[in-house]
Amino acid sequence: LSHGEPVGENPSPGNKAGGISTLEDKALGCTQKCGKSYVEGVLPYGERLKVKGLNLLSAPGNDLVAATALASCGCHMVLFTTGRGTPFGTYVPTMKISTNSTLAKNKPGWIDFNAGVIVENEPMEKTCERFIDYISPGSKRRIRKQRKERLQRKLRSSRQE
């Protein structure tokens, strides 16, 4: 904003209705969704991903433009959270994740996964497990295998002590 660039309808009317008042608020909220991972890199628009881990992408915040920017840097799937819904998609598989069950119920053609059940008291762990199963059916087996290997390493190291 300090560079005088136009931001148009950003934050969007839906963002504003949800309590986001500035573009900085929106960016911080997006970064917060990444959890506690360290930022490994920042990609300019159109640059390919080179470093494993959490990378931030410097690109416009418009949904369609942002999804296209993600695809241009090598993204295989866009996980798009929404509280109001959007029918857009892009040439990379775009999964829309509802933050409320009303939206998921009213727009089943737009929403792929309902995460709104968390605020209806479904345990976060259960929702996460269902989500991982949904986006990658084989991932549950990989996670179980990784946990088993980690436990086996701990057991071996405790026996050596």
Question: Which stretches of residues belong to each language-model region?
Answer:
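Anaerobic metallocofactor- and corrinoid-dependent redox/one-carbon enzyme cores
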Residues: 1-161
